[in-house]
Amino acid sequence: MLPTLDARLSAAAELVRPGEPVADIGCDHGKLTAVLAASGRYPKVIGADLRPGPLAKAEQTLEYAGCKDRAELRLGDGLSVLSPGEVSTIVLAGVSAQTTWEIIEKAPWVSAQGGPRLVMVPATRHSDLRRWLWEHGFALAADRPVQAAGRWYAVMAAEYTGKVKTPTFRECLFGLTGQWPEGEGYAAWQKAKLPRLRLGVPDGTELAKEMDELIKGESKG
């Protein structure tokens, strides 16, 4: 039986390009790994996790889905389980923004021309991940807002270009989510957090001014 994906993982699956090898890093119980493998659209599917327990669950998931022979499971830390160039897309779902960029930083071959597409679903700090990606030479190819279990998530795809960008606070807050019908709801959720964040920003700064404008609703997300 094929597992059911929530909105986050469904959106992530749609950003994996058909016909190319893919790795699901931090695969947990292997739901996304199983769906990708069962589709038959990818020449190689790798699921990896740091912990033996979840990886054993992932093996069961693949078996129940009838696609155990179409995916390879690996035990290891982050991208250390992969060889440079082994896959064209890397999925990093369900970890924090900081953990996401720390995983990327430990694999220099990812931050290179012709490197893999990164599909990311940060559990927290969406704005910080966008800023990190832009400041480290990555371009956002997709930035889709989705709701799952009553929470908003941003499902991002990024590719290394080497072009460093210094983004504004507003760009980091909303990214490209305004391109989607769900963008209005995501923007409202992001704005709702601003009053608390504003407390830690000194008055008179450009950041304070931009935050105040957003809080007052003078700018739309």
Language-model features, listed with the residues they occupy:
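Conserved SAM-binding motif I beta-strand of class I
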Residues: 44-49
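Conserved class I S-adenosyl-L-methionine
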Residues: 19-28
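Class I S-adenosyl-L-methionine
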Residues: 2-7, 80-81, 86, 98-221
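Conserved SAM-binding loop of SAM-dependent methyltransferases across substrates and taxa
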Residues: 29-42
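Conserved SAM/SAH-binding beta-strand->alpha-helix loop
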Residues: 51-53
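S-adenosyl-L-methionine
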Residues: 1-20, 34, 56-84
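Short SAM/SAH-binding signature in class I
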Residues: 86-94
